[in-house]
Amino acid sequence: VTQRQYQKIAVIGAGLSGICTAYFLAQAGCQVTLIERHGNVAEQASLGNSGLIAAAGQMPTAAPGLRKKILSSLFNADSPILLSPTLSPALWGWLRKWMAQSQLERYRLNKTRMTQAALYGQQLLLQLQQQHMIDYQASAGVVQIFRTEAQLAAATKLRAILVDLNIAHSLLDAKQVRHLEPNLNSTTALAGGWHFPQDGAGNCLFFIKQMKAIVQAMGVQFQFMQTVTALQSGEQGAILTIDGEPHVFDAVVVAAGAGSNKLLKPLGIRIPTTIANSYAAVATIKNPEFAPRGAVLDAHYKTAIVRIDERIRITGMIDLQPGRRARAMHPQAMTTLLKIADDWYPDAANYNQASFWSGNVAMLPDGPPLIGATPTPNVFVHIDGSSDGWAGTVGAAAALADLIGGRQPEIDVSGLQLTRYH
């Protein structure tokens, strides 16, 4: 594959994956058309991103102990996983794949793959910030907190992974955690935590909107309110049916998140995603002296509490209940997100006036982003397998642009491609 073969490229989806892929393709000299069925960038999963720019703090959802969490989710009202006792055969099959990835060795491998993509993404974000004067309200440092000694002990067993990956981290007791985050509620049980000084957080939506202007200046064409209904591949390249009309490109990148499989399945391309609902709450800070200093991860609930400018963003929950595919906020999710914020920062914000977001996300069973070629010529993918951070998505986009252009990526992409499932 040479870059010359793929000069005119369509990218489907104007979320974080799509717009970053478009940027790096345009930077390499490609003519890029970004096609989006909504009226603007970041209208779906990217809108609900946690804001974490994390390499150390981003963990695969398939972690040791997942099977127990799935079982307990059927009986606990405030479980981070929302699951119905009645499962479809397809969802049950996906859950089995998800649980298989929670074995320690698989977790170690997936964590390594996610970390290398995120570390690369962090470097690229700094370059983009300097080159284009992007301001995405960045903050430094992430603290992961554990409510019980058992949770802390379980996490400590995984410390070797952090050491092997040469990730800067500190194991903290409760007093040290409160020194870093002095506004944590003193009445909520706290056993200890991890501090990841090189991780951080930022406003993903701000970043995407600024990237939109940047790629437009680079010549990327946007087609909003346009729906791709079919994909084909032939000798002339990739043929996209857009609102009933055929359009020919040298290649296409499917970066449509939860809508990707619908386009890929007719080509016989099988990607092991399931569609989940993800949730976020945003509350305006009323008492800055009681607010988080930076980004906090509640290990028990797999939930991020992130201060971005004058707001607190609480994101988490994995809703795998059938029938909850529309943008409907689950009452249980609303209650749990606000409970977590109130547990740790009760006086920081007007939680009773919080705004909520709910949207579909594509979940991969293992966690690392999925990029690269497919068995169908001229058809590439970029699917973010996790919604709890965005550094890895940026790194994966740059690596994908290199693959499409016939260049050697800066990171090992063997574990980020479709072949990892075969």
Predicted features and spans:
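N-terminal Rossmann-like FAD-binding beta1-loop-alpha1 element of flavoenzymes
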Residues: K8-L34
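Short beta-strand to alpha-helix junction loop
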Residues: L109-L119, Q144-A154, W194-A213, A326-A333, ...
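Glycine-rich phosphate/pyrophosphate-binding beta-alpha loops
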Residues: Q58, D199, K302, L320-P322, ...
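Glycine-rich FAD pyrophosphate-binding loop
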Residues: Q27-L47
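Dinucleotide-binding Rossmann-like beta1-alpha1 core, especially the glycine-rich loop
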Residues: G48-A174
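Helical element adjacent to the flavin cofactor pocket in flavoenzyme catalytic cores
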Residues: A153-L165, T188-A238
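Active-site substrate-recognition segment that forms the wall
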Residues: N49-L52, G57, T61-A100, A230-A238, ...
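C-terminal catalytic lobe of FAD-dependent flavoproteins
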Residues: H169, D342-H422
